[in-house]
Amino acid sequence: MTKTMAEHISVMLNESVDMLVTDTNGLYVDGTFGRGGHTRLVLDRLDKGRLLGFDKDPVAIGHGKLLEQEDARFSIVQDSFANMAEHITNVFGVDRVDGVMMDLGVSSPQIDDAERGFSFMNDGPLDMRMNPDKGQSAAEWIATVSEKDMADVMYQYGEERFSRRIAKAICEYRSHTPILTTLQLSKIIAEANPAWEKGKNPATRAFQGIRIYINNELGDLEIGLEAAAQALKVGGRLAVISFHSLEDRIVKRFMKLQAKGPELPRHLPIRNAHLDIKFKTVGKAIKPSQSEVSENVRSRSAVLRVLERVSD
């Protein structure tokens, strides 16, 4: 594990790149550039290969532009990985690549920068957008959303079991005072949450749910997985690191469907051998080592899964 570009520590760096790079002269995609940790190691492994990076975050794009100037094999695009197909064609001039990498969720620099509005530990404007120039901020959403829809978002995307109680408290507070900062919201949630998990801030799940909704993270993930699989050459691999159960469930389900086909009723005279299966999963899910978790506690929930195209 290597500390790269400021304070961000890339999770399962060697494990993921070992799985990803199968051809040193191939074409690769990093769907989540961040601060370039995985990108730089991929470039180190490549000879004449090329790499295309994606990120929504303008700060990440700034780092990517610097790397573009350093290494002609690398290009960066400010967009969601869900839209990778058109950019692959535009940049590489082909529609198939040798590998796609996704390191999901919010990065350490985003969490630690109070001005971005992701943190419930440091006070800042309640924003939470990966790209602050697009879409509705968390503060704008909280000011207008119905109590029911707010509770549904925290429950579905944050798995917050006290979502209704928390949403009620937020709506009561906003009726007399605008909610504009992260600590303002965090305090309301903490006071409404009757059962704090040991070692976890009471606002963790609610903040996660709001952030995922504001950025359409799960919608982008579902589209991006499909786009990545379609973009792979035979022998090409999709490597995905997820950080919470909602993401991992989507990734696991998608890869299982691609590798095994749909679940069929037992009485049907059709078996997997009769299906046109184009992919296989590579090994079992990989989790960070104990030493990595000791060095970087944010890696503790990470899961790496890999899918490989075996035929057209």
Swiss-Prot record:
Superkingdom assignment: Bacteria
Gene3D superfamilies xref list: Putative methyltransferase TM0872, insert domain (1.10.150.170), Vaccinia Virus protein VP39 (3.40.50.150)
Binding positions (S-adenosyl-L-methionine): G36, G37, H38, D55, F81, D103, Q110
NCBIfam families: 16S rRNA (cytosine(1402)-N(4))-methyltransferase RsmH
EC number: 2.1.1.199
Catalytic reactions of this protein: cytidine(1402) in 16S rRNA + S-adenosyl-L-methionine = N(4)-methylcytidine(1402) in 16S rRNA + S-adenosyl-L-homocysteine + H(+)
One example GO MF annotation: rRNA (cytosine-N4-)-methyltransferase activity
Family: Belongs to the methyltransferase superfamily. RsmH family.
InterPro entries, alphabetized: RsmH, SAM-dep_MeTrfase_MraW_recog, SAM-dependent_MTases_sf
Gene Ontology biological process terms from the UniProt entry: rRNA base methylation
Summary of the function given for this chain in its UniProt record: Specifically methylates the N4 position of cytidine in position 1402 (C1402) of 16S rRNA.
Cell location: Cytoplasm
Keyword entries, A-Z: Cytoplasm, Methyltransferase, rRNA processing, S-adenosyl-L-methionine, Transferase
Keyword Transferase: yes
GO cellular component: cytoplasm
Protein name: Ribosomal RNA small subunit methyltransferase H
